[in-house]
Amino acid sequence: MTVKPEGRKMLRIEKKNAESPIEQKPRWIRNQVRTGPGYEDMKSRVTGASLHTVCQEAGCPNIHECWESREATFLIGGDKCTRRCDFCDIATGKPAELDRDEPRRVAENIQEMDLNYTTITGVTRDDLPDEGAWLYAEVVRKIHELNPNTGVENLTPDFSGKPDLLQEVFEARPEVFAHNLETVPRIFKRIRPAFRYERSLDVIRQAHDFGLITKSNLILGMGETAEEIEEALRDLRSAGCDIITITQYLRPGPRFHPIERWVRPEEFVEHSKLAKELGFGGVMSGPLVRSSYRAGRLYVQAMEARGLELPENLKHLAETSQGATAQEASTLLEKYGPSEETPVTTRMAKTPAQSNSVAATIR
C-alpha cells in the first residue's frame, strides 16, 4: 500500500501517524506454515472456481489452520467504508452502488468450498437508508438456504445502534452475531471516531436480549493499560457477550496508529484466564489471533457454556474443534518459552513498491 490514500487527501491524523516509522516485530510474532489435506483441498477449490475470500486477499497468517478446519471469511458490501478506524486498512470513501446479487454469490462460493463454518464481515454503509442491514441479513439467509450444514457468524458494524435495523439482522438468525468493540473507553474516540463505546456495547446487549450467541474482539498495543482491558472485558460480559477474542495490534502501514507496545504471550494468557473467570463461554487470546480465527471452535464452546446442544445439522463442528490452536498464547509459550519485555523499535517505512502491508483487523 502507498502512504497516500487512494482517491482522497491524507487526514491530519494520518500525517501525524506517518511521522512514526514502521515497528519491528518481536520473535514470538512469527507464523510457521503448516499445510494438510484439508487446506490443499480448499486451495484447489478456490483456485479452480476463481473464488475470493478475506483469508487470501488480506494475507491472513492463519489461513492454513482455518482452511484445514474448512473455515473461511468473506467481506461484503464493497471495498470502501464510510468510516475510518485508525487500525484498519480498508479504504475510506464513497462506496459503489449496493450489489443485491452479492448474497447469492457468497452462498454459492461457500457451497463450492464445502465450508463447515464461515464468518461474514463487511464495510460500514452509512450511505444507505438501512446502513446495509438488508445485505447483512440476506447473506445469512442465502447461506442457510444453500448450505444448511454450514455455521454462519455475522460480524457487523453498529447500524448506528438503531433497534429496527439490528432487528432485521438478528432475525436472519446467524449462529453467532459479532460486533467488535476493539479498544478501551479512554482511547476509543481517538481510534474509532465514528463509533461510540457505549453504543457498541448496546449492540451486543440487543443481540443477547434477542437470544443470539454474541461475540466481540479487543485489539491490544494501542495505548491501553491492563486495568482498562479488564474494564472492557467486564463491560462486554455485562452486556451479554459470550465469546471474546484478544489480539495484538499490527500496524498495516505508515498512515495508521503507531504500535504503543508489544504485548507478551504471558499477558495474553492472563487476559484469557480473566475472561474465563468473568464467564465468557469462548475465549481465544494471542498475538496473531484474529476475530474470525477458529470461529467454529469458539461457537461450539459458547453453546456448551450456555448448556445448549448443537443443532443436528451442525454437530459435525464439535469434531473440528478439538486439539491445540497454533496462535493461542499458551501454545506460543510452550513453543518459544518465557518472553522478555520487548520495547517497540522501528525500521524505515517501505516505499510504495516495496510495501506489502495487510489489514490488522477487519471490522
Swiss-Prot record:
This protein's encoding gene: lipA
Keyword Iron-sulfur assigned: yes
Matching Gene3D superfamilies: Aldolase class I
Protein name: Lipoyl synthase
Pfam families the record matches: Radical_SAM
A GO molecular-function descriptor: lipoate synthase activity
Segments for region (Disordered): 338-363
Location of this chain's protein in the cell: Cytoplasm
